């Protein structure tokens, strides 16, 4: 799959098929269909969002997911103990256990993102993943919703994440479009332009 180049303030198109048919999409589809068949979507989807929040908010948890030096049985036991202590249901715990045994834990955040996109598509919504250097204010959320509506995204579910490495600005991904107005991207572009001028 070719990696798109994103220009600050611009957009790029990323293949939706690669998300739906890739490994995260296959696992997410399996979880969605299992939950739908068992009438557990109202339980599983909020818990998947809570798990994504746990991953985003805890550096140790993220490190555990990507650590390939630990024994998989130990990692699985530790993860399931954390999920049990946090009150996650049996479906999510079992799903994470399967992912762990299949040695796909590093893909768990992408799987949860794909699940979010699948659920939104089933509801007829677009998911706007917004990454900012600082948490958005209520005014910024309203302005962002308005801008997205102007761009033709009338039913948008905004999912926010904070990444201080952006330094400023936003990175917004809606469906196959990526809008990058982050200061980090602008500085990178300036750096490359200055290297080319030398």
Curated annotation (Swiss-Prot):
UniProt entry keywords in alphabetical sequence? ATP synthesis, Cell inner membrane, Cell membrane, CF(1), Hydrogen ion transport, Ion transport, Membrane, Transport
Keyword Transcription regulation included in the entry's annotation: no
Gene3D superfamilies registered for this protein in UniProt: N-terminal domain of the delta subunit of the F1F0-ATP synthase
Regarding the membrane, this protein is recorded as: Peripheral membrane protein
Any single GO CC term annotated in Swiss-Prot or TrEMBL for this entry: proton-transporting ATP synthase complex
GO: which molecular function terms?
A: proton-transporting ATP synthase activity, rotational mechanism
InterPro entries in the record: ATP_synth_OSCP/delta_N_sf, ATPase_OSCP/d_CS, ATPase_OSCP/dsu
Q: Does the keyword Transit peptide apply?
A: no
- Compartment(s) where it occurs, according to its Swiss-Prot or TrEMBL record: Cell inner membrane
Q: Which Pfam families match?
A: OSCP
| Function according to Swiss-Prot or TrEMBL | F(1)F(0) ATP synthase produces ATP from ADP in the presence of a proton or sodium gradient. F-type ATPases consist of two structural domains, F(1) containing the extramembraneous catalytic core and F(0) containing the membrane proton channel, linked together by a central stalk and a peripheral stalk. During catalysis, ATP synthesis in the catalytic domain of F(1) is coupled via a rotary mechanism of the central stalk subunits to proton translocation. This protein is part of the stalk that links CF(0) to CF(1). It either transmits conformational changes from CF(0) to CF(1) or is implicated in proton conduction.
Describe the protein's quaternary organization and the partners it interacts with: F-type ATPases have 2 components, F(1) - the catalytic core - and F(0) - the membrane proton channel. F(1) has five subunits: alpha(3), beta(3), gamma(1), delta(1), epsilon(1). F(0) has three main subunits: a(1), b(2) and c(10-14). The alpha and beta chains form an alternating ring which encloses part of the gamma chain. F(1) is attached to F(0) by a central stalk formed by the gamma and epsilon chains, while a peripheral stalk is formed by the delta and b chains.
Q: Which family does it belong to?
A: Belongs to the ATPase delta chain family.
Output this protein's name: ATP synthase subunit delta
Q: Which organism is it from?
A: Gluconacetobacter diazotrophicus (strain ATCC 49037 / DSM 5601 / CCUG 37298 / CIP 103539 / LMG 7603 / PAl5)
């Amino acid at each position: 799959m070719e990696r798109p180049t994103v220009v600050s303030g611009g957009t790029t198109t990323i293949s939706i098929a690669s998300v739906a048919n890739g490994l995260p999409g296959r696992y997410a589809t399996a979880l969605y269909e299992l939950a739908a068949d068992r009438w557990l979507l109202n339980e599983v989807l909020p818990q998947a969002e809570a798990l994504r929040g746990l991953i985003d908010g805890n550096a140790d948890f993220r490190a555990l997911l990507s650590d390939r030096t630990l024994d998989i049985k130990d990692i699985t036991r530790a993860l399931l103990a954390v999920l049990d202590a946090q009150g996650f249901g049996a479906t999510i715990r079992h799903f994470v256990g399967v992912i762990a045994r299949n040695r796909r834990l590093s893909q768990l955040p992408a799987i949860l993102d794909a699940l979010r996109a699948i659920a939104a598509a089933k509801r007829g919504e677009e998911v706007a993943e917004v990454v900012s250097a600082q948490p958005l204010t209520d005014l910024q959320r309203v302005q962002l919703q308005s801008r997205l509506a102007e761009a033709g995204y009338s039913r948008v579910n905004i999912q926010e994440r904070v990444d201080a490495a952006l330094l400023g600005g936003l990175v917004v991904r809606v469906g196959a479009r990526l809008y990058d107005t982050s200061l980090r991207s602008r500085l990178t572009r300036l750096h490359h332009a200055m290297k080319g001028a030398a």
